[in-house]
């Protein structure tokens, strides 16, 4: 007889980032273009507060952010007054940014960043399998949860203890973690700095 090897279906694998902490130029490095050049603009699992930072006075112009809100729906911010030698936050929370545009010429440089990342989030709202995750830990310790159906009350599909300074790369079987009712993320602690999650989408 012939042996047949059955492989898991991993077509259509997507990736999302989980980010914690404050980084004033995570989304866009300091520059003077009225349409900011985006770097790491998502998609993020955990919704982020978007910030604008400048060493100059940009209070005379406004900025509009376009992207996706905490629920993954298309969103456009209200006009946000620019910073005056400091940092200002854009209203709402965001899982992705597709553009940041100024109403006029920028004085000195403007950078866009993130702060206050949520401790829960949606990996994928429908039936999916989480395939892998990789990341780095900072100081402290924490616990990462992958849940089915809800970030708060869903059944745990993975519980991962994270130690200070450790590499986050847990073993996940070839079949992945099946989340019939959607894959959700929850986190408790201070150790995780950044995490990338791959899933069927």
Model regions: which residues?
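Surface-exposed, low-hydrophobicity beta-strand/loop segments enriched in small/polar/acidic residues
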Residues: 3-201
